[in-house]
Amino acid sequence: MTRMAHDLIRPPKARRGERVAVLSPSFAAAGAFPAVHEQAMRRLTEVTGLIPVEYPTTRQVGAAPQARAADINAAFADPAIRGILAVVGGEDQITVIPHLDAGLARRDPKPFLGTSDNTNIHHWLWANGIASFYGGSSQVHLGPGPGVDDVHARSLRAALVTGETIEVTDPGESEDVGVDWGDPRALDCFGDREPTGSWSWHGPARLVSGRSWGGCLEVIEQVLTAGRFPFGPDVLDGGILLIETSEELLPARNVGWIVRALGERGILKAAGAVLVARPPVSDFERRPPAEERARLRAEQRDVVAGMIGQYNPEAVVCVGIPFGHTRPQWILPHGGAITVDGTARRVVADYS
């Protein structure tokens, strides 16, 4: 594994019966849709054996950034809290970051799980020397539907409790959106699922093992624009770049623009491998026919893989892994080790 200059701590795991904070660093979906949230909390304990603890802004819709940051700081400061989970993403977490206390996180690092807008916190932790886990929105992946998807439950337990190494495999089905959380059917029904195809591999047939960095592409752009990645691209040398896109459904052309900017920043050249998540291509208002959905996914795949190839033809690229805004979702290490085998076409994640 390539060693990078910026060392990262991997927080210790929780033990069954211990407490984990459930926070709303962005949108407080727990307050807007409490029935789904409460089912998520029950399932969290069933799947992990851990006890969820809510904070003042967990259910407070519209809480100020300072108040949300105070809850994050309090969770890191409490020695009884052994992990932190975000309820969901949002769109203004960038305003929370200036109010966080890095000293508290460094004194008692603990696993943090979240996706989408929580890319802000992942990068704040990474910059302060703490690894985390990308994925795990309780409002999306624990509360809705008849149960928790197997791949999500396995990676959730690994991230919080067991720390095992797992091969990341395709679940065989996917949904872009579930049932509206305000609809009682959300507690019992999945969204419209469709079969998935094979992942798409690009670049040389070689094995790359390194630590991961990345997240939601639209938020990575914000992080870099705000100057909150205070390193040169060499700190990512040989690592695994994670890229996924949000429910905003950016056209492939716009996605390509952001990826090209990462290339100009030197980030694509530094990566040993790139994992690109299966993108959502529909929402509640826009549900194209199956052929159009397949075309939209292929268009993004071709643009992203082509752009990476221009800047780094030696990178191993795998497109289609469900670690982003679709469900079922794998939680992946952020700052931890991932092995991408372009020869055997396998991906293995170390959750220690």
Where do the language-model regions lie?
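ATP/NTP phosphate-donor binding region
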Residues: 2-80
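Short, acidic/small-residue loops that bind anionic groups at enzyme active sites
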Residues: 100-125, 131-140
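Oxyanion-binding "anion nests"
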Residues: 212-254
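A short helix->loop->beta-strand "cap" motif at the edges of active sites that frequently abuts
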Residues: 80, 105-111, 128-130, 271-272, ...
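Buried hydrophobic positions in well-ordered alpha/beta secondary-structure cores of metabolic enzymes
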Residues: 22, 84, 117, 220, ...
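N-terminal glycine-rich "phosphate-gripper" loop used for MgATP/nucleotide binding
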Residues: 85-94, 99, 115
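Conserved anion/nucleotide-ligand pocket segment
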Residues: 134-217
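C-terminal active-site/capping subdomain that shapes the small-molecule cofactor and substrate pocket
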Residues: 252-352
